[in-house]
Amino acid sequence: MKEKIPFYNEKEFHYMMKKTKKGTFSGWYIINPENNSVEFSGSFNRQFKLNKPVIPVNTEYVTRKEFNEYKDSNDQRLTKIENKVDKLEIKVDKLEKKVDKLEVKVDKLVETVNAQGEDLNNFKVEVRGTLQSQGETLQLILQTLQGMSKRLDSVEGRLDSMDGRLDSMETRLDKIDPLK
């Protein structure tokens, strides 16, 4: 699809004349939006044909100087970005080294915790053994005390019976030996 645009505007015509400096143009220029090309139709004089103007299409045109400035600024930005990336890579390397050191420390701590866990388990076994032996000893002491308690009860019973006998003997003696 080509679009024909006439030079209705006087300002546009004078702009074209400034570009070419000399010459006249009457006719149309055609813009092809597919490839942003411009075609002319109409009559040109010889001088105008030699100094073909650049007609702006829907895109912007830049000069070589502007392009180089833009390119230089992009190069500078790219250099800054590359420097930042390099610095970040160095920081990442340092952090990786720190992480490696911390991993070694964590491994040592894990070994220490495992060793302490084993010591604790051994201590628990020893304490259980000690408690069991103490419990057995206490059971034996309890049995001994119960046996002694039974003996004391029997001795007490004997003493009570002896006390009763003594009382009866005293009463007999009192009866035999009346008041002197």
Swiss-Prot record:
Provide the disulphide bond pattern. none
Report the domain of life of the source organism: Bacteria
Please name the InterPro entries in this protein's record: DUF16
Spell out the Pfam families in the cross-references.
DUF16
Family designation: Belongs to the UPF0134 family.
What is the name of the protein in this document?
UPF0134 protein MPN_368
